[in-house]
């Protein structure tokens, strides 16, 4: 019997002959399972604006503790109506735009909401519960590096960073060849000592 190659020798011979595949632009919603060919970079800062990490009230931290009038209510997806003035608060939803002038958000659990005013019994630290603009990523930062296979986590991060399409390697074409004199395809009559070939289907699936 001819000498068999070791696994290391087989890997070396294969890698010596491998050539990188060309890349193509792929829409993000068709990129699952593809391999990134160039670093994919954020289109926008993430978050793209200072946002609230909690449902609560945007305040100036030095105005706490105390009872503050509620000047406005900020829903997610809507801009703040104006700058927050000294001595007032604005109700804010998780993900809402923190108004200029505010430097903290105090969660609902820690206040007494009187509809038109809010009672805050403890001081809150500057920057508490505020996600600063670009705190996760800045525009131009690498979101997914070259060579990474795209799964749900990577696709979600790319979508959040505003990436609509990206360069991916073209899909490789491969053939599976199974050998053995004892092998027969399913559906044929087995002879003495023969078995049905199953590994090819497993590898190709």
Show which residues each predicted segment covers.
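Short, low-complexity N-terminal leaders and the immediately following helix N-cap/first helix
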Residues: 1-68, 116, 132
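Short, glycine/charged-enriched hinge/interface segments at domain edges or termini
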Residues: 2, 13, 40, 58-205
């Amino acid at each position: 019997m001819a000498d068999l190659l070791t696994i290391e020798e087989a890997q070396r011979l294969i890698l010596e002959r491998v050539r990188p595949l060309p890349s193509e632009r792929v829409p993000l919603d068709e990129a699952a399972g593809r391999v990134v060919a160039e670093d994919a970079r954020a289109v926008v800062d993430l978050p793209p604006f200072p946002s609230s990490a909690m449902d609560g009230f945007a305040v100036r931290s030095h105005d706490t503790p105390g009872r503050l009038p509620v000047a406005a209510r900020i829903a997610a997806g809507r801009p703040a109506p104006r700058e927050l003035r000294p001595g007032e608060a604005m109700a804010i939803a998780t993900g809402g735009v923190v108004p200029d002038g505010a430097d903290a958000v105090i969660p609902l659990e820690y206040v007494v909401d009187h509809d038109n005013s809010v009672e805050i019994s403890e001081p809150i630290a500057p920057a508490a519960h505020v996600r600063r603009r670009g705190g996760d990523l800045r525009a131009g930062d690498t979101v997914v590096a070259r060579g990474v296979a795209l799964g749900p986590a990577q696709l979600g991060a790319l979508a959040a960073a505003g990436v609509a399409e990206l360069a991916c390697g073209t899909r490789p074409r491969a053939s599976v060849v199974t050998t053995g004199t004892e092998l027969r395809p399913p559906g044929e009559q087995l002879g003495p000592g023969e078995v049905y070939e199953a590994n090819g289907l497993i590898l190709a699936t």
